[in-house]
């Protein structure tokens, strides 16, 4: 279902990175029905080593939990941080060059006017027919009211947000010129950024805290899913988190 034309992305949810690679290989490339698809080269060498690869990590997010974290998440942070540090140690032993990085200092979340405007356009027929009144969740932050609010996004705000989005993409490309991929917790603020810039990412199970899986995210350069997948495969070959499942009884 279309939600936001310039941000919607199709991805796979699989047990292993190898499975993700198979699904991605089937999905990628033009099919003649979507003019936004790019016929970019994709060469995956899953057995290539990681030695010498430049791997960044968002230093702030490896050292403190998100400001938006719940009380439970803040309580669990020390255990999660140990899992993240273990992941860094694993990559360090694999011979990668780890380097701390910081995200571009631009208000990624504040330009979500783009996201909301595109959602309003995608559901324009529903809005005009009054179908949003039948949606569940009538509270102020519910989907129905979110769609109504898209009617009142000023054109000036939308255009300015597009300009900031362009700057954000330029700064992300400059950042990615310094590293092959970068690592972050799965609840990283980078998801707001890459949602706008299109940089590919892969989330892996990095362990468990109080019985709940916690993730490690690998983000790569534009159209370089192959490197993201290769790094993810190396991580899963060195760990067993992805093979753990809850008891069925």
What feature does the model see in each segment?
Residues 35, 40, 53-54, 73, ...:
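Flexible, acidic loop-helix segments that line cofactor/substrate-binding pockets
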Residues 19-23, 83, 161, 212, ...:
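Short amphipathic alpha-helical coupling segments at ligand-binding clamshell hinges
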Residues 76-102, 123-136, 158, 162-179:
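Acyltransferase
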Residues 1-81, 238-249:
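A short helix-breaking turn/cap at a secondary-structure junction
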Residues 1-27, 185, 195-217:
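Short glycine/serine-rich loop segments
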Residues 170, 174-200:
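An extended, acidic, His-containing surface patch that forms the Zn2+-binding/catalytic region
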């Amino acid at each position: 279902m279309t939600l936001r034309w310039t941000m919607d992305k199709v991805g796979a949810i699989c047990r292993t990175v190898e499975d993700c690679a198979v699904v991605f290989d089937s999905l990628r490339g033009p099919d003649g029905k979507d003019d936004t698809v790019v016929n970019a080269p994709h060469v995956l060498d899953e057995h290539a080593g990681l030695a010498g690869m430049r791997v960044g990590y968002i230093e702030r997010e490896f050292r403190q939990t998100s400001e938006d974290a719940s009380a439970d998440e803040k309580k669990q942070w020390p255990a999660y941080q140990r899992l993240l540090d273990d992941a860094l140690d694993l990559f360090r032993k694999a011979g990668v060059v780890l380097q701390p990085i910081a995200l571009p200092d631009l208000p990624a979340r504040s330009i979500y006017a783009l996201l909301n405007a595109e959602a309003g356009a995608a559901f324009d027929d529903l809005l005009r027919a009054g179908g949003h009144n039948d949606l569940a969740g009538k509270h102020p932050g519910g989907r129905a009211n979110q769609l109504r609010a898209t009617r009142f996004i000023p054109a000036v705000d939308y255009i300015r947000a597009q300009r900031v989005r362009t700057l954000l993409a330029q700064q992300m490309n400059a950042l990615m010129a310094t590293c092959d991929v970068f690592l972050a917790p799965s609840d990283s603020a980078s998801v707001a950024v890459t949602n706008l810039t299109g940089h590919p990412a892969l989330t892996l199970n990095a362990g468990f805290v109080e019985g709940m899986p916690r993730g490690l995210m690998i983000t790569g350069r534009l159209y370089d899913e192959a490197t993201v997948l290769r790094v993810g495969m190396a991580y899963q070959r060195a760990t067993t988190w992805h093979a753990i499942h809850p008891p069925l009884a």
